[in-house]
C-alpha cells in the first residue's frame, strides 16, 4: 500500500521514502513596492502568480530560462511580454517581485505556484529538428524549453525521458 504524508506545504513521503520537493505553493499579500517571497526550500525556476482577491489582475508566468523580463499572461491571448516589475529575481529560497499590480498590488492576496527545474542551468538539446535550450528536472518529469520556431512542422527536444503531457 502507498502511504502519503502531507505537511501542509508539500507531499513529504511516498511509501515511507522521503522525496525531494519540486513543487510548492505559497500565499502572500502584496505590498505595492518590492518584496521577497521565501520559504520554498529551493530556487523556483517556473513561477505562476495568481491574485485571489477577486480583481482582474492577470496571471503572471515567468521562468528562469527566459529570464525575469519575459512573462506570459495565461488568461490573455497575447504573446509573451516584457515587464521588469513582476518577478524581479529567482532566489535560493524563493523569488522577488516588483511593484506591478499583477504580482504585488498593495493589500492584494496572491498564490505563487512554483516548480524546480535545474536551478537556472540550461543546456543545448538537438534531439528534435530544431535545436532547443532546455532546463530539465527528469526526476520530477518537468522541463522548461526555449526555441525559435520555423513556422513549419518541426520537433523539439525537451530533455525528458518521455513525451510531455502538458505544454504551456
Predicted regions and their residues:
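A structural motif specific to WD40 beta-propellers
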Residues: 12-14
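Surface-exposed receptor/substrate recognition regions of extracellular proteins
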Residues: 1-9
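Surface-exposed molecular-recognition determinants
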Residues: 7, 16-168
